[in-house]
Amino acid sequence: MNTGAPWPSADEAEARVLEIQTKLHQWATDDPDRRFSDLDNLICDPAFLVVAWRRVRSNRGARTAGVDGETAYYVTAKLGEEQFLADLRAKLKARTFRPQPVRERMIPKPGGKRRRLGIATVRDRVVQASLKLVLEPIFEADFKPCSYGFRPGRRAHDAIAEIHYLCSRSYEWVVEGDIKACFDEISHSALGDRVRRRIGDKRILGLVKAFLKAGILGEDGAERDTNTGTPQGGILSPLLSNIALSVLDEHFAEAWAKVTPRARETRRRQGLANYRLIRYADDFVVLVAGTRVQAESLRDESAAVLGTMGLS
């Protein structure tokens, strides 16, 4: 479909995206070692851009502008949606698209504290949304059942229900983890290594890196580099964070897979610990059937695994 052709309707775009996502997920599931190339054409495919735009436009942040001062309403009323998407697609195809710094705002919290809010430009949000449409079905094939945060068809209540169930199954200790400044501290090089396990398309890898390095424009007007972490408030950030934090999921899943129900009973009789991980984004618990010393050892083990991603 060329830039002069009519853009697909919303229904047509959703159907095409779902069809391609289903194929990507199936291919990733069938071959756990497959590295995907030739994905950059999907990022600028009209159907993917239409779906990405609709998701950005329907988001509650659509009325908020990034560093360029443009909101989703401005795009609709002044630029025209098709022209906006056509211009964005042309830049992506010509490889002249460059993410802009994230606009930072400090939001008051109860108790006098403030939290940082990052606001990307509408253009950057659309490209991030399109990237997510392509990458998510691939990495979903690898994500473990113990991960519940920011995943399709999963929610916090599911994680809570799993914890309640496991707590009724002889798990006596709970190791609670809250990863310090997770979204700010993830190592770019370590994250890049994990993305490259599945993605061989240099254009896609370059786009991901460009968003990671886009920088932040503070309220004082000063621009700061982003040498660690995922884009503040970015549509792509939860997926990238899950890719990084799945290092913990994989570590525990690998250990769990080696232990059959009979072996777990044998471990219990021998005084060895049995344990399960439940993670929701940057919060996790390890439920332990064993002693306090064993629970503390698993806490240290978790910290060591997360340390490989620059986290503590």
Residue ranges and their predicted role:
Residues 1-82:
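Non-catalytic, polymerase-adjacent accessory regions of viral genome-replication enzymes
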Residues 16, 118, 122-132, 136, ...:
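Duplex nucleic acid-engaging cores and interfaces of nucleic-acid transaction enzymes
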Residues 17, 21, 36, 49, ...:
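Short runs of predominantly hydrophobic/aromatic residues within well-ordered alpha helices
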Residues 25, 57, 105-108, 118-120, ...:
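Residues in well-ordered beta-strands of folded domains
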Residues 52-56, 130, 207-212:
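Short alpha-helical scaffolding segments that buttress acidic/His motifs in well-ordered protein cores
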Residues 62, 70-114, 125-133:
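A contiguous, low-structure linker/loop signature
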Residues 75-76, 121, 286-290:
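Short beta-strand-to-loop capping motifs
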Residues 91, 100-101, 110, 142-312:
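Conserved polymerase palm-domain catalytic core
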